[in-house]
Amino acid sequence: MSRPPRPTSSSRSNCSGGVFDWEPALRKLDELNARVEDPTLWNDPDEAQAVSRERSRLSAQVEAVHGLERDLADALGYAELADEEGDEASLDEARAQLREIKERAARAELEALLSGEADGNDAYVEINSGAGGTESNDWAGMLLRMYTRWAQAHGMSVDVIEETAGEQAGIKSVTLQVKGTNAYGWLKTEAGVHRLVRISPYDSSARRHTSFASVWVYPVIDDNIEIEINPADVRTDTYRASGAGGQHVNKTDSAVRLTHIPTGIAVACQTQRSQHQNRDQAWKMLRARLYELELEKREAAQQALEDQKTDIGWGHQIRSYVLQPYQMVKDLRTEVETSDTQGVLDGDLDAFMGAALAQRVGATRDAAA
């Protein structure tokens, strides 16, 4: 077995110099540690929390690189010993370890791209079916399952905040709260229109149908972030919670919808039985939407890149899913594609997310150059 060289500080620098510059990262971490230890920092609680969050994020990235180095050195040492002893079984085990380390390194490299102001936050994900009735509703339901599977595979939790079921199948709309490290940073790459082409299971003539659904993603924001909202600018509507039915569906007008009149942004919550609780959650969601809008404006002003916006229209297709007459999922932004349609629909989205994230960061760097 031909063994690669052991890692050194030089090779480490070369490996991590693309999106995660090692020496600048260590200097930045030292600077953040010094700031956290400065008692005067805590005179401004908001600034102190921001510095602490940044230190935690960078510290986790540095530790991830250290962990990869340790595991790589161990795996190479194990492979060397197995090679000297002619132990093929142990060599196969070492190869498997190296493949796993390579996958972790690729993931760590992508994680280093998540440096946006809200990338580390939890995320709200809204899915809305397009025109087409049952077909589009079923497609929206398939997307709900896909994102739930993706989140669960990455150790994240998913709560349904609001859901409107389709008449025959699927959903008309749903709002999810995805909780986990960098949930927003990853999921923001999924904002856009998703197109499905298949032989309809609801068409007795077995004709091919095209369906659309939109995905909107925005960050869950901390309660201490100040978003000024004039109550006079918000219209409140109440209605009965809807869903799959059964004894748990509330028979009173406990669901709440808030509409921010100046922007037209509307949010709804029906998770709780209490109208008061639903109202509180809806206000949090509205603040988050307006916060995302503000982030969007900043990015647009700084980068002048309209295609970075998450404010989507039906013409903003990002991905096509073809199930018949052939099988292919293709991202229209990055050209990443795969014939493993079932794997994608089961939540295997990392290749698409990673490519879109790298493209975003590359566009941002080009704009800043």
Curated annotation (Swiss-Prot):
Main localization (coarse): cytoplasm
Domain of life: Bacteria
Pfam families listed in its UniProt record: PCRF, RF-1
Post-translational modification: Methylated by PrmC. Methylation increases the termination efficiency of RF2.
N5-methylglutamine: residues bearing it: 247
Subcellular localization(s) per the UniProt record: Cytoplasm
SUPFAM superfamilies the UniProt entry points to: Release factor
A GO CC term attached to the entry: cytoplasm
SMART domains assigned to the protein according to its UniProt record, in alphabetical order: PCRF (SM00937)
Ranges in a coiled coil: none
GO molecular function, one term: translation release factor activity, codon specific
Function: Peptide chain release factor 2 directs the termination of translation in response to the peptide chain termination codons UGA and UAA.
PANTHER family documented for this protein: CLASS I PEPTIDE CHAIN RELEASE FACTOR, PEPTIDE CHAIN RELEASE FACTOR 2
Family per record: Belongs to the prokaryotic/mitochondrial release factor family.
The name this protein goes by in its record: Peptide chain release factor 2
Annotated source species: Phenylobacterium zucineum (strain HLK1)
Gene (UniProt): prfB
